Amino acid sequence: MISEERLLKVILAPHISEKSTVNAEKNNTVVFRVAIDATKAEVKAAVAQLFEVEVDSVRTLVNKGKTKRTGARVGRRSDWKKAYVTLAEGADIDFVGGAE
């Protein structure tokens, strides 16, 4: 079992984009920014416990940070990890929280 403290550190934020919105509508898949060292099992457990939904599958990828210039200096943005979480039929996560 994963500790409560670790579960809260795994999911950083929902990743809202045009692609993630289409995925949510068509495939019942939500996208999260997660900790770079998080495993698929940790992401699955965190989503299941924090949002009280059943998770079918988790797919992860690491986005490499871009090289950026500020004047003469060259820097690099941090790498970050994204997780596509497919929910079970009938499960839903509402990030907007609008009144029903």
UniProtKB/Swiss-Prot annotation:
Give the matching Gene3D superfamilies. 3.30.70.330
Question: What's a Pfam family in this record?
Answer: Ribosomal_L23
Q: Which key words are in the record?
A: Ribonucleoprotein, Ribosomal protein, RNA-binding, rRNA-binding
Xref: PROSITE patterns:
RIBOSOMAL_L23 (PS00050)
Q: Name one GO biological process term.
A: translation
UniProt-recorded Gene Ontology molecular function terms: rRNA binding; structural constituent of ribosome
Database matches in InterPro entries? Nucleotide-bd_a/b_plait_sf, Ribosomal_uL23-like, Ribosomal_uL23/eL15/eS24_sf, Ribosomal_uL23_CS
Q: Which SUPFAM superfamilies match?
A: Ribosomal proteins S24e, L23 and L15e (SSF54189)
Recorded GO cellular component terms are: ribonucleoprotein complex; ribosome
Q: What's the superkingdom here?
A: Bacteria
What residue ranges carry the coiled-coil annotation?
none
Described by its record, this protein's role is as follows: One of the early assembly proteins it binds 23S rRNA. One of the proteins that surrounds the polypeptide exit tunnel on the outside of the ribosome. Forms the main docking site for trigger factor binding to the ribosome.
| Quaternary structure note | Part of the 50S ribosomal subunit. Contacts protein L29, and trigger factor when it is bound to the ribosome.
Family of this protein: Belongs to the universal ribosomal protein uL23 family.
Q: What's the protein called, per UniProt?
A: Large ribosomal subunit protein uL23
Q: Which organism is it from?
A: Shewanella pealeana (strain ATCC 700345 / ANG-SQ1)
Q: Gene for this protein?
A: rplW
